[in-house]
Amino acid sequence: MTRLSFTVLIFLAAYFGSNIRPNVATLDPKTVCYYESWVHWRQGDGKMDPEDIDTSLCSHIVYSYFGIDASSHEIKLLDQYLMITLHDMEHFTKHKGNAKAMIAVGGASMSDQFSKTAAVEHYRETFVVSTIDLMTKYGFDGVMIDWSGMQAKDSDNFVKLLDKFDEKFAQTSFVMGVTLPATIASYDNYNIPAISNYVDFMNVLTLDYDGPWAYTVGHASALPEQLKTLEAYNKRGAPRHKMVMAVPFFARTWILEKMDKQDVGDKASGPGPKGQFTQTPGFLSYNELCVQIQAETNAFSITRDHDNTAIYAVYVHDNHAEWISFEDRHTLGDKARNITEQGYGGMSVYTLSNEDVHGVCGDKNPLLHAINSNYFRGIVTEPTVVTVTPVTHTTEHVTDIPGVFHCHQEGFFRDKTYCAKYYECKKGDFGLEQTVHHCPNHSQAFDEVSRTCVDHAKIPGC
């Protein structure tokens, strides 16, 4: 690749919109799998090692995280004993299979150091060269730059840093990626047209739109919000095929303020309790949650949005209720199909250690399988049910709270207080699940006999 001056390069990128980076990444949908090295130190089913990664389900596996040395500005190992003495990095690249093995540099605590390193030409050179040396020595195929919290004042220096990587990557097959935030206030801190021309893909952190830091409950990663973020970057110059959408393999949890107030937007008193492995208030890995649901099915009420792109559970125990926003194989499969149909580049998963990699709840890696199986063959979304065939009724006990609907058997049931609202109850992965539907017109009522929406005057009490 012919080198151009930085100024001319940026001009040509903006004017022609051409790709500066060689196209070394696959054009097929990507599944970018983040692996946190520190999960080696967990116990029991929470522990994970590189050998536990099913690389056939990942196009890229990302070893997280590396830092930057404050004195030398070289790439920094954050756990030398694990990474070198225990040969963890070598195990990671040895077991990569056909996936691209990458390193992630940065994270939430590295913004200030990135700012200092990227501001000086000599520091940029040192950091990039040391990164390439490490990747070459241990068999990595590329790097993800995760400059979390970058400020507008650093925008030009970020592009200069990517330009330095581009210079040193010339005539190599190294993969270059960056991570972008989902916060609206941060969008314009990034020179998206310039960045797009330097990278093979952009990992957009479409996570945590709601969480226990806010004292109201809500879907942590609802698809409409995720799509708004992707569209915002697309309007700023990011090609759709270069963006991968981050999805959580974890749940966000709250303690409800009132046990009978369980809808999206209702108040919470704080975060849910720590999980057995993750040990973080308001946070559960999927493998922690699925074990809990299977062990106490009767204490959980699971509600799925009518479009199948969001799901939550309410867990009633010890005189309080937890509200849990999570993903399952159905929501993730729908998201995978939806975004690839729109031309986006795939998904990144946060993180492999949160997946059921050991198969403690059933088959191994159910979430990864759902994502990959839906990239290439579409699943027809079921329309809102107006007429349905008779169903087989099965009865299960669910902890009841006065004034709150719970599924006790499969079927369709009208809400007791709002006749245009009705519930579909059917078997899911974790027992009975309910999906909330509404009649097209608020003056209608749902008729449980005909299973259609009719004029409310035809239904006694409506």
UniProtKB/Swiss-Prot annotation:
Domain (Chitin-binding type-2): residue spans on this chain: 404-462
Q: Has keyword Glycoprotein?
A: yes
Q: Check the UniProt entry and state the signal peptide residues, or none.
A: 1-25
The GH18 domain is annotated at 29-378
What GO CC terms are in its UniProt record?
extracellular region
Q: Where in the cell is it found?
A: Secreted
Which tissues show it? Expressed in the peritrophic matrix of the midgut, and only very weakly in fecal pellets.
The record's disulfide annotation reads C33-C58, C439-C453
Which InterPro entries does the UniProt entry name for this protein? Chitin-bd_dom (IPR002557), Chitin-bd_dom_sf (IPR036508), Chitinase_II/V-like_cat (IPR011583), Chitinase_insertion_sf (IPR029070), Glyco_hydro18_cat (IPR001223), Glycoside_hydrolase_SF (IPR017853), Glycosyl_Hydrlase_18 (IPR050314)
Which GO terms label this protein's molecular function in UniProt? chitin binding; chitinase activity
Keywords assigned by UniProt, alphabetized:
Allergen, Chitin-binding, Disulfide bond, Glycoprotein, Secreted, Signal
Swiss-Prot/TrEMBL GO biological process terms: carbohydrate metabolic process; chitin catabolic process
Question: Keyword Signal: yes or no?
Answer: yes
Residues with an annotated glycan are N338, N441
Q: Cross-referenced SMART domains, in alphabetical order?
A: Glyco_18
**Matching PANTHER family:** CHITINASE (PTHR11177), CHITINASE 4-RELATED (PTHR11177:SF360)
Question: Any idea what job this protein has?
Answer: Probably a non-catalytic chitinase-like protein, which binds to insoluble chitin and enhances the activity of the catalytic chitinases. Has weak chitin-binding activity.
Family per UniProt?
A: Belongs to the glycosyl hydrolase 18 family. Chitinase class II subfamily.
Q: Report the protein name in the record.
A: Chitinase-like mite allergen Der p 18.0101
Please give the organism: Dermatophagoides pteronyssinus
